[in-house]
């Protein structure tokens, strides 16, 4: 993987040199040529994102569906190998790629919005804040704590300082991030799963278990993965988020 990343980074550097070489020496404006295109892309995607975020997911009206269709159009134009290179590239290369593709720009903007909410939002007593994070992941913040479940994202490891524990329902790559898992282990924070470590690790749940982490009361059980023939593959989490949320219970079983 390191060799692949080095090759990708070298190709990115050569591409960047090509853009510089093609620049017009007599025109130093950052609003023309390649830079101008990037600025227009950012402005368009920012406007689309704000249209989505200013609407309610509970009300599916024409405005929201039109915005979602536009975002789907961004995704349809992104080649899978380009997205894979973005996910696996060095941080600097991936950050630069975000400026060149609308769906990747949106992908990062959505993550930054979630991070801002986790770090800065104040959760009132009797409530909980919930963010859906591409594509199976959730982050839940309460007045007294924060946890995440099934997070798979290029920048997932940035969540580690701000969450108290992480849950992973099963070993499918769209449900976990190795970088985030390792960051949590490095910080000495609990990672609940049925496969990451053997049963000597207290947070390995291969069946019915009960945990208390802060004000969170967690129950686990094991189940099969839909019709894929994977028996006892998925851990179901039932998480009582505490009295300061009105004993809100979050359940995740995907």
Where does each model-flagged region fall?
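Short gly/pro/ser/thr-enriched loop/turn and capping motifs at secondary-structure boundaries
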Residues: 198-200
């Amino acid at each position: 993987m390191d060799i692949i990343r080095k090759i990708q980074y070298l190709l990115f550097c050569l591409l960047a040199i090509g853009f510089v070489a093609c620049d017009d020496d007599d025109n130093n404006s950052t609003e023309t040529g390649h830079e101008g295109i990037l600025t227009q892309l950012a402005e368009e995607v920012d406007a689309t994102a704000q249209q989505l975020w200013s609407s309610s997911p509970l009300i599916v009206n024409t405005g929201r569906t039109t915005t979602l269709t536009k975002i789907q159009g961004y995704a349809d134009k992104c080649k899978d190998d380009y997205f894979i290179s973005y996910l696996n590239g060095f941080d600097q290369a991936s950050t630069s790629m975000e400026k060149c593709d609308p769906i990747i720009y949106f992908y990062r903007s959505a993550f930054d919005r979630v991070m801002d909410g986790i770090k800065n939002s104040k959760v009132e007593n009797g409530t909980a804040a919930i963010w859906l994070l591409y594509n199976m992941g959730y982050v839940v913040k309460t007045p007294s704590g924060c946890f995440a479940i099934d997070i798979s994202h290029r920048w997932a490891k940035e969540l580690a300082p701000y969450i108290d524990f992480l849950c992973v329902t099963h070993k499918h790559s769209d449900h976990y991030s190795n970088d985030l898992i390792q960051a949590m282990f490095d910080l000495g924070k609990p990672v609940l799963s049925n496969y990451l470590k053997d049963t000597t690790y207290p947070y390995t749940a291969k069946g019915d278990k009960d945990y208390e982490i802060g004000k969170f009361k967690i129950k686990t059980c094991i189940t099969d993965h839909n019709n894929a023939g994977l028996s006892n593959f998925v851990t179901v989490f039932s998480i009582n988020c505490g009295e300061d949320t009105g004993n809100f219970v979050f359940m995740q079983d995907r």
